[in-house]
């Protein structure tokens, strides 16, 4: 039985509840392009999706974006005095500042954007960044 998954505006089907990341893998049917979506709005950061650049476990695009997001989230908690609402699961992460946004957190988000924009420039078919 096939399961339907929706990630933002990108839809894909997979069998057996597993995602291989390999677009040529048997049982993986693409309805639309797999892509990591990164949205930054008023210093809230949301990362969702899977790049599909390489098979699961060896996808350098996913690994790069994940490392940058995890560093942002942990750095915000450890290096600033702010309070944040966070949500993380496979293929999804979100951090939202609660209350006043500190200059330290603004710097962390700016650094995160430099990193993900670099990845998006190198892999434009796999990562898109929307920032205000």
Give the label of every model feature segment.
Residues 8, 22-25, 102:
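Serine/threonine-rich low-complexity intrinsically disordered regions
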Residues 61-65:
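Short, conserved glycine- and acidic-residue-centered signature motifs
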């Amino acid at each position: 039985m096939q399961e339907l998954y929706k990630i933002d505006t990108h839809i894909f089907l997979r069998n057996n509840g597993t995602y291989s990341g390999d677009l040529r893998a048997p049982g993986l049917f693409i309805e639309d392009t797999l892509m990591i979506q990164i949205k930054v709005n008023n210093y809230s950061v949301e990362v969702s999706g899977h790049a599909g650049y390489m098979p699961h476990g060896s996808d350098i695009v996913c690994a790069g974006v994940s490392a940058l997001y995890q560093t942002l989230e942990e750095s915000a908690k450890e290096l600033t005095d702010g309070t944040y609402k966070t949500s993380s699961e496979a293929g999804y992460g979100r951090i939202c500042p609660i209350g006043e946004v500190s200059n330290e957190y603004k710097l962390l988000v700016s650094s995160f954007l430099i990193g993900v924009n670099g990845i998006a420039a190198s892999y434009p078919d796999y990562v898109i960044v929307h920032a205000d």
